[in-house]
């Protein structure tokens, strides 16, 4: 879909989309084998105020050069890398390094798969800005989200 001119044209026609949309690209299909058409469209998306995020980081074979070239707004560390941090010092070191790389490039880093209090504490200690996972709650319907926020239920797990 990223190569689809219709996507760019539709977003350009809709003012509401500016600065409200984030497109997540899978690390495994984009970073190392980027196409000039993709590069052009990503530039146009940025001009329209669309944030670019890399999803499932750590599961593909991306290079640091690919990361620098794309310069995403957000880098989402895959849950497979987060799961073992409670028991593995080497895994914690790897996650800390990824977070530090993101920070050095002014990229927001988001950890997916936060499922325990220990995950939360380790990632907070590392300065991870965005945490996502079942520790906070399960997915829910939009109409349930309004009540959840109003009653501040989310505060009990943070």
Question: Which functions belong to the PLM regions below?
Answer:
Residues 6-9, 37-47, 96-100, 122:
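Alpha-helical scaffolding segments of alpha/beta enzyme cores, especially the outer helices
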Residues 1, 20-33, 50-158:
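EAL-family c-di-GMP phosphodiesterase catalytic domain
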Residues 6-20, 42, 68-71, 124:
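Acidic (Asp/Glu)-rich catalytic clusters
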Residues 4-6, 14, 35, 150:
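Serine/threonine-rich low-complexity intrinsically disordered regions
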């Amino acid at each position: 879909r990223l190569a689809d001119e219709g996507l760019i044209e539709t977003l350009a026609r809709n003012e509401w989309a500016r600065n409200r949309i984030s497109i997540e690209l899978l690390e495994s299909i984009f970073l190392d084998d980027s196409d000039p058409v993709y590069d052009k469209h990503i530039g146009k998306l940025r001009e329209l105020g669309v944030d670019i995020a890399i999803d499932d980081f750590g599961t593909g074979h991306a290079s640091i050069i690919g990361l620098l070239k794309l310069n995403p707004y957000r880098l989402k560390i895959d849950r497979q890398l987060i799961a073992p941090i409670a028991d593995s010092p080497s895994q914690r070191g790897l996650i800390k390094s990824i977070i530090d790389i993101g920070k050095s490039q002014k990229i927001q880093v988001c950890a997916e798969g936060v499922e325990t209090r220990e995950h939360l504490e380790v990632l907070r200690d590392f300065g991870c800005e965005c945490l996502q996972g079942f520790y906070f709650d399960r997915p829910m319907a939009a109409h349930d989200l309004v009540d959840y926020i109003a009653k501040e239920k989310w505060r009990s797990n943070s």
